[in-house]
């Protein structure tokens, strides 16, 4: 995983009942809810600091709500094709084999190996190696996929040890 820090403006929408004396708290909560730990366009905000030293731009009324561009210092994380990650092998059935790596889900394609069911548990076989469900494995990221709301998703292959 790689990361970078940038200054930017994050647009958030506030409803009229949120425009009270607690507006700073409501803005902070709206920014965190909309952007923190959410995968958007291949990157995820891991840390957001709202800049108090910069004046807040005027809001814009849109459909009976107020859109505010909030000045922030944002630490983004992202993954590259070719990165090697480590996580837990999760075999739900023959067609759904993933590796869970915190904020990253690696999907293994059918041609990555075969799934077998023996001794009341699933096993994944690749190049003569057997991997039990639930063990720690390493994988190389092959192709970015459409992410979920709070996770990156990549096609990956297990790195044979």
Swiss-Prot record:
Keywords: DNA-directed RNA polymerase, Transcription, Transferase, Virion. Its EC number is 2.7.7.6. Pfam families: Pox_RNA_pol (PF03293). GO terms for biological process: viral transcription. GO terms for cellular component: DNA-directed RNA polymerase complex; virion component. It is an enzyme of class 2 (transferase). It catalyses: RNA(n) + a ribonucleoside 5'-triphosphate = RNA(n+1) + diphosphate. It comes from the Viruses. One of its GO terms (molecular function) is DNA binding. Apparently non-glycosylated. Part of the DNA-dependent RNA polymerase which catalyzes the transcription of viral DNA into RNA using the four ribonucleoside triphosphates as substrates. Responsible for the transcription of early, intermediate and late genes. DNA-dependent RNA polymerase associates with the early transcription factor (ETF), itself composed of OPG118 and OPG133, thereby allowing the early genes transcription. Late transcription, and probably also intermediate transcription, require newly synthesized RNA polymerase. Belongs to the poxviridae DNA-directed RNA polymerase 18 kDa subunit family. The DNA-dependent RNA polymerase used for intermediate and late genes expression consists of eight subunits Rpo30/OPG66, Rpo7/OPG90, Rpo22/OPG103, Rpo147/OPG105, Rpo18/OPG119, Rpo19/OPG131, Rpo132/OPG151 and Rpo35/OPG156. The same holoenzyme, with the addition of the transcription-specificity factor OPG109, is used for early gene expression. This is DNA-directed RNA polymerase 18 kDa subunit. The gene is OPG119.
């Amino acid at each position: 995983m790689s990361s970078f820090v940038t200054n930017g403006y994050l647009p958030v929408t506030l409803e009229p009942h949120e425009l009270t004396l607690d507006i700073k708290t409501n803005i902070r909560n709206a920014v965190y809810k909309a952007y923190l730990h959410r995968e958007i366009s291949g990157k995820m905000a891991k840390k957001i600091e709202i800049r108090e030293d910069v004046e807040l731009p005027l809001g814009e009324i849109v459909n009976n709500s107020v859109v505010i561009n909030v000045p922030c210092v944002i630490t983004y994380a992202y993954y590259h094709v070719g990165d090697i990650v480590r996580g837990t092998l999760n075999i739900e059935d023959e067609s759904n084999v993933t590796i869970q790596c915190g904020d990253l889900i690696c999907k293994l394609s059918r041609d990555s190996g075969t799934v077998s069911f023996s001794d009341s548990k699933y096993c994944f076989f690749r190049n003569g190696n057997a991997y039990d469900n639930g063990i720690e494995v390493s994988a190389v990221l092959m192709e970015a996929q459409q992410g979920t709301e709070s996770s990156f998703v990549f096609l990956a292959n297990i790195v044979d040890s």
